[in-house]
Structure formats: structure tokens, C-alpha cells
Amino acid sequence: MTEVKSGLPLVSVLISSYNHADFIEASIRSVYAQDYPNIELLVVDDGSRDDSVAVIRRLQEELGFHFLPQANKGLCTTLNEMIARSAGLYIAPLGSDDLMLPERLSLQIAFMEQHPETGICAGGIVLIDGESKLLPDKKQRYRPARRLDFDDLFMDRKPGPPAPTLLFRREALEKVGGFDPSIRIEDYYVELRIAHAGYFIDILEESLALYRVHGNNTYKNRRLMIETELEIYKRFEDHPGYEATRLRYLNAMFAKVASEDRALASELLTQIPWRSRNLKTLKGLWRYCFTRAA
């Protein structure tokens, strides 16, 4: 793919594969189905325990992309190492269970080339299940195009960019030092840092990727997720909207976990002052008092 001399900027697509033997082939082939002509594909298997390596090696022999199997290092470290080895002016991480739609990169690059102030370009997603069937329309997420600055993202004024569609300007990623291995919610934190550095995040209205919803990609450790999100907010505690953002999140998470983890719900509730409680708090209290935890 990198032999093409199109005059268009090179895009480095990075796939960090982990235990997705059933899905990785579709992800890789979706990269080769792009109508954008100047792409390099780097694939790393990050210590999978299934047949992912065998599947990827077979595809590598057929298609000729860069492939490296390794012991598990974690997603952020792996992505940073892949970025260092890549050559593209634009970086497109792709989940090893997700798929690019054919016009994705051509639409994003056309936009990014016209908007040097944009550090990240994203777009809509279409939800599919583990068998690649579309989820019902009521579960799909159709949203208009939008531009986000730091305040929009940090204070949740507008819906953020769908992770399966993120395209980074290399310059922006390098300016903030890449992904932070100490933060588990890697996409949200790097988005905030890039926006904080003065770049915009633009989300196109077009659907650009198929996002696979299946049993192995749900975030099961709710406590760790909440602690990580609060740690991300704390790294921007000098922002005037920090306390409002933190309290809004605590209220929302209390309502969400009240019926499933009473101990965690109690801890969250103690962090919400009476004056900052709202309808979500009341909803959570109802669930806490009248719903039996699973």
C-alpha cells in the first residue's frame, strides 16, 4: 500500500490486536478496502492467547503489511511504539474488532488538509454485533457534524468523537507526547490534551466506521473506570469548570451504579455535597433503596 505515489499525505493505520481472532481479518481487510490510495498498515499482536497471531500471519503473507507479535505491553505503550515506527503525517488507530467504511480516510484527509487548526477528525459510527449484523435503529447513534474545543469536551457541552473513527494529525500527537500509559481511558485523555494544546476536534456527519458491540469489549471494571475518569478531570483542576464537571460526573455515575454496586454507590454519594445533588441523584437514590443488586 505504501508504494503508491499519489501526492496525497501518507496515513499510518495502527491496529493493536488482542484476543480478537474472530474479528481481526475483517478489520484488516477494511483497511485494504479504503478508496484512499496512500496508506501504510502496522499491526501488532499484544500477547493474544487465542489464534490471532496465526490469522494475522496468514493475512500478512497475502497482503504484505508490517506485523509484530509481542508479549503484552498494554494498548498505550503499544500505540506509542507503533507511532514511533510509522511514517504517516496522519495516524489512524483501529480497534482489532472494528471496521473502517470504504470512504473513511478519503473524507477525513480531505477535511484535515483544508483545516490545519484541526488536531483530530472523527465521524459517525454504525453499531454491529459479534456476527456483523446491524443493531436495531433505536440503538444507533446519528449525530450532526460538530466542532469541539477544550471546554466543549471537558465540560461535556457537545458529544465527543467516537473512538473507532479518530484520525490524528501527527504534529498534534507529538506535541502532547502521545498516549499516556498511566491512564486506562486512553482516547479521552489524549483528546483533552490535544484540545488543551489549542487544536480543534472536528466530527463529520458521515458514518466512517462499524463499531462492534460484543461480550468481550464491554468495560466491566466500573470502579476503575470511574477512578480513571476522575483522575483525568483532576489533571485539569485549574480549569474554572473543573468542580462542575467532576460533580456532574459523580451524579451521573451514582445513578448508574446505584442498583449494581451498593458499596461503590455509597462512596460516590459521600463525594456529592447536598447543594450539588440533582435529579440524577434522586434517580440513583430510588434505585439504591428499592432495587435489589444483582
Predicted features along the sequence, with ranges:
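C-terminal subregions of glycosyltransferases and related glycan-biosynthesis enzymes
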Residues: 3-8, 189, 196, 201, ...
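A conserved acidic beta->alpha catalytic loop
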Residues: 30, 45-54, 73, 95
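Conserved nucleotide-sugar donor-binding catalytic segment
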Residues: 84, 142-232
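Short aromatic/hydrophobic "clamp" motif used to bind/position activated sugar donors
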Residues: 91
